[in-house]
Amino acid sequence: MAGLFGTTTSTTTSTLGDLKNDVELGSPPEDSITDLSFNPNPNDPKDFLAVSSWDKKVRVYEIAANGQNQGKVQMEHEGPVFAVDFFKDGTKVISAGADKQAKVLDLASGQAMQVAAHDAPIRCVKYFEAGGTPMAVTGSWDKTIKYWDFRSATPAGTVQCQERVYTMDVKENLLVIGTADRYIDVINLKEPVKFYKTLQSPLKWQTRVVSCFTDSQGFAIGSIEGRCAIQYVEDKDQSMNFSFKCHRDTPQNNVTNVHAVNAISFHPQHGTFSTAGSDGTFHFWDKDAKHRLKGYPNVGGSITATKFNRNGTIFAYAISYDWSKGYQGNTANYPTKVMLHPVLGDECKPRPSVKKR
């Protein structure tokens, strides 16, 4: 069967993945890449990828079925851009960053307008719908999340968090927020201004990323200590919670180098997920079988953001400096690029179910 970037006949059972078919985006950002978002509209025949960067810009690329790509439109903020998300219909993107504001870019007209503001940089922004009404939720270092109806200049609601917001994800009615001091807040968007549940991360070190399951029954947490946790929302499912080590080098002389988990993305169809880290590798996992499906060779730099497209045939990953080694690591020749990995064969398919003991 022909598919993205050619054939999809790869059915190797090896756990070592292949990068030889990966395609680089042309005209990449000029500074570290912070976030990726694909157009989610199933009726749009084309894939569009939005990319936010420390160079103060949001760029939107059109990606053809053979992997060829071109920049379509871009928008500039007044400071580094930390987050970007597509609207459900694929006609607009919303982005936010260090300039303490969120902006909406209309892809057809190229026009941008401010839609949100905080008292400190906005670290996260997500689009969602409330009763069919397009809305956004922003999370800031001012220790609040705010909800925005685009028809109003004032927030539709504000929630005070325990600490600065570092990461956030939305899936259906599930909103998960990760803050400083390892707090994890869970909100049911049917009751958006109160916490459904608050917990301390089961991981002992700083939270880098949270990502909601495809079925919105739970979420994954990644930390700076090369560890990932799988966490279910409801108390009745707590026995299925677990954590595992990842993005760690093979021990040398009893020393293990531990790398941050920078990004976690769930496959939209299979419910399997990826982790990517400061070590420059990404892996695909099956949480239900507690099994690593594929691991990939080092890509030559830290991976700062990842995303699957709407049908899971493309896995995009951003290579750029993540400051995990301080200013000394920020060399002039450090790569800054976005790669498109064609998801072939069984790379992301879950293992056949087996009876649990």
Swiss-Prot record:
Keyword check for Secreted: no
Key words, A-Z: Membrane, mRNA transport, Nuclear pore complex, Nucleus, Protein transport, Repeat, Translocation, Transport, WD repeat
Cellular component GO terms, alphabetical: nuclear membrane; nuclear pore
SUPFAM superfamilies, per database record: WD40 repeat-like (SSF50978)
Disulfide bonds, paired cysteine numbers: none
Disordered: annotated segments: 1-31
GO BP annotation list: mRNA transport; protein transport
Highest taxon listed in the record's lineage: Eukaryota
Pfam families on file: WD40
UniProt feature coiled coil, ranges: none
Membrane topology field: Peripheral membrane protein
Keyword Lipoprotein part of the UniProt annotation: no
WD repeats (start-end): 28-71, 76-115, 117-158, 160-197, 256-295
Membrane spanning residue stretches: none
Subcellular location: Nucleus, Nuclear pore complex; Nucleus membrane
Family statement drawn from the similarity comment of this UniProt entry: Belongs to the WD repeat rae1 family.
Self-association state and partner proteins as the record states: Component of the nuclear pore complex (NPC). NPC constitutes the exclusive means of nucleocytoplasmic transport. NPCs allow the passive diffusion of ions and small molecules and the active, nuclear transport receptor-mediated bidirectional transport of macromolecules such as proteins, RNAs, ribonucleoparticles (RNPs), and ribosomal subunits across the nuclear envelope. Due to its 8-fold rotational symmetry, all subunits are present with 8 copies or multiples thereof.
Function: Functions as a component of the nuclear pore complex (NPC). NPC components, collectively referred to as nucleoporins (NUPs), can play the role of both NPC structural components and of docking or interaction partners for transiently associated nuclear transport factors. It is specifically important for nuclear mRNA export.
Name used for this protein in its record: mRNA export factor GLE2
